[in-house]
Design a protein with these regions (language model features):
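Short, well-structured alpha-helical segments that form the helix of a local strand-helix-strand
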Residues: 64-73, 128-142, 157-165
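Interfacial segments of multi-pass membrane proteins
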Residues: 118-123, 139-140
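Short glycine/threonine-rich catalytic loop with a Thr-x-Gly-x-Asp
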Residues: 101-118, 128, 153
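Charged C-terminal helix
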Residues: 143-174
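Glycine-rich phosphate/dinucleotide-binding loop and adjoining beta-alpha-beta core of small-molecule
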Residues: 1-100, 173
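Hydrophobic, well-ordered secondary-structure elements that form the walls
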Residues: 20, 112, 131
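Extended hydrophobic-aromatic, low-complexity segments
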Residues: 54, 96, 107, 128-132
Length: 174
């Protein structure tokens, strides 16, 4: 029922959209449904979500970059493949890596924070690629602030949110 609802909603979006978590899981084995989107879109899978959508990732980073670039172009979306490094690819073939490692971000809810940051940037008029790049960087910086304050083991996604102001106040970061 949820899978059908997600698939049925895709062509009705009128503003740029982010698909994460259960929206991606609803497309399991049906990535061609992404082509029904009529607006710019960002998908933000981690490795397991990627596997359900597209199949397993290669092991070598250069092969990961290649396949992410290929899928972004094929399905006309911006992809933020979460991991270390996070691989961001546009539908036009541009690929970027954000390499900050922080095990404190590998927790449930952290991807929701990332999606929220990216969505806020999209709402301000940034392109999907700009929002994905800047949002991923802001998320990593806020995660680093939280890690320094609390340690990676004890930090929570809410601590990343609390650290956003530190990132924005430090003008040299932006």
């Amino acid at each position: 029922e949820v899978k059908k609802m997600v698939i049925d909603l895709l062509p009705s979006f009128t503003s740029p959209v982010i698909l994460d978590a259960d929206a991606l899981n609803a497309l399991e084995g049906k990535p061609e449904k992404l082509l029904s989107l009529k607006v710019p879109a960002i998908i933000t899978p981690h490795a397991r979500e990627w596997g359900r959508l597209f199949g397993p990732l290669p092991t070598k980073i250069e092969d990961v970059i290649s396949v992410v670039k290929e899928k972004a172009s094929q399905y006309k979306v911006t992809i933020v493949l979460k991991g270390v490094p996070t691989c961001i690819a546009s539908s036009k073939g541009e690929v970027y890596l954000v390499g900050k490692a922080n095990s404190g971000l590998a927790k449930g809810g952290s991807g929701d924070v990332l999606a929220g940051i990216i969505l806020a940037l999209l709402a301000q008029g940034l392109s999907t690629l700009e929002a994905a790049l800047l949002g991923t960087w802001i998320h990593a910086e806020a995660g680093e602030h939280a890690r320094k304050r609390l340690g990676s083991f004890s930090m929570l996604p809410s601590d990343v949110i609390d650290s956003l102001s530190s990132v924005f106040m430090n003008k040299k970061d932006l």
